[in-house]
Design a protein with these regions (language model features):
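Acyl-thioester-processing domains in fatty-acid/polyketide/NRPS systems
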Residues: 1-217
Length: 217
């Protein structure tokens, strides 16, 4: 089912309501080694009933030798960026299942993460374990060809919650995204190192005796 949402036929995942998107661009789950949902096994809430909270429980079977552990200076820690994907991908699943995108069936809408807060309560070693995610779709507001939804998530492993938070996603038309200038106001921002002459840069060996003297060790 998750594979169909990522790369296959979304109708096979979400039902005949989504047959209208055959051959069209629509929201998809990340795939391949960045598909961080193994299964969805508990889903409550009726499609298009946005005045009621919809809930979902999903699981991710964390590979013991996943690429984000192998290529990590601290292989016992799941990188925060990956942890966020584990938390947020089921939010995308419940958003699609809710039918919000069907509010504007004639439009090709793009799904974007807008905001969020997360609290890391513990930092367990997740290698070879299963992470459970309890997600709530709290609100849905549609106006002017745009849809905004808010969620809460709670990640646990072996019965212990270790990461929880809230987030906001939105559906937008391509035209509205093209008109957004972003945090930089539309100005081109070049990397700091490109703005500074190389002859003014200093190479520091973090393991050298001189560097340790500089920082007072």
């Amino acid at each position: 089912m998750i594979w169909e949402f990522a790369l296959g036929d979304v109708e096979k995942c979400f039902g005949s309501d989504y047959s209208i998107y055959k051959g069209r661009s629509m929201q998809r789950n990340p795939n391949g080694e960045l598909q961080l949902i193994s299964r969805v096994y508990d889903l409550h809430g009726k499609r298009m009933e946005f005045d009621k909270t919809m809930t979902l429980v999903s699981e991710y079977d964390v590979p013991e030798d996943a690429w984000f552990f192998r290529n990590n200076s601290y292989p016992e820690n799941m990188p925060y960026s990956v942890l966020m994907e584990v938390a947020l991908q089921p939010c995308g699943f419940i958003s699609t299942h809710s039918g919000a995108i069907l509010t504007y069936p004639e439009l090709d809408l793009y799904y974007r993460n807008l905001d969020g807060n997360g609290t890391l309560l513990r930092n367990p070693d997740l290698r070879g374990k299963t992470v459970l995610n309890e997600v709530k779709l709290l609100t849905t507001v549609a106006s002017g060809n745009t849809i905004i939804q808010t969620h809460r998530f709670s990640l646990s492993c072996e019965g212990q919650i270790f990461f929880e938070g809230d987030t906001m996603f939105g559906y937008f038309t391509g035209e509205s995204l093209a008109a957004q200038v972003g945090l930089d106001g539309g100005k081109k921002a070049v990397p700091w190192i490109d703005e500074n002459a190389s002859d003014s840069s200093i190479l520091l060996d973090l393991n050298s005796v001189d560097f340790r003297k500089t920082i007072g060790e």
